[in-house]
Amino acid sequence: MSSFLTTVNQRTRNQFRPRASGKGGATSYQLRQYAEATLGGGSLRKVVKLPEGEDENEWLAVNMVDFYNQINLLYGAITEFCSPQTCPEMKATDEFEYLWQDTENYKRPTKMPAPAYIEQLMSWVQGNIDNEAVLPSRIGVPFPKSFPALVRQIFKRMYRVYAHIYCHHYPVIRELGLEPHLNTSFKQYVLFIDEHNLATGKDFWGPLGDLVDSMLRSD
């Protein structure tokens, strides 16, 4: 599966588009560059807070695009290790298999290999980001009333990519030297969801619940 292009949007804090790198997706060097620019240092709890005077929907939009880019690059770094043969189902642990459903092509929950699921997911998120009716490209244009609910759904679905990577590709992440970047990116994701009440229930974190609890206690 070819790597996705990182979204460039006026709301993206770091406008970074990785070069195409073939089957292997984003390179480790690219990911390190982006992580250093995006994550920085200091308390991640402070990073995720709504800045004084900032519109909440604008802040949700900025971070949604940024996390899409981070997940895109993390998964892009390990795509050659995630195939229909190695990952015939989109799973975290055996208890958590994710089925794809949308309003156009898959109106019923559909089982598919992890790469196909993730491609559908990232294309769906990209489609929402590119939709002017959902995410106006000009800052100051009002968001639709349905935007907060859509953001919750997007964050819930993007979490599944983190869960799949942690449960099925963590050894490869360590071999590539990307463990700190995965952990920092995911911790920021967890803290952002916690800060802005985006979790949709007590079972939201499922297979990574213990890791999430640890991250919430440590910041």
Curated annotation (Swiss-Prot):
**Superkingdom per UniProt:** Eukaryota
Named from the GO MF annotations, one term is: protein kinase activator activity
GO cellular component terms, semicolon-separated: cytoplasm; medial cortex; new mitotic spindle pole body; nucleus; old mitotic spindle pole body; Sid2-Mob1 complex
* One biological process term in Gene Ontology: signal transduction
| PANTHER family linked | MPS ONE BINDER KINASE ACTIVATOR-LIKE MOB
The UniProt family comment states: Belongs to the MOB1/phocein family.
Protein name according to UniProt = Probable maintenance of ploidy protein mob1
Q: Which lineage?
A: Eukaryota, Fungi, Dikarya, Ascomycota, Pezizomycotina
Report which gene this protein is encoded by: mob1-1
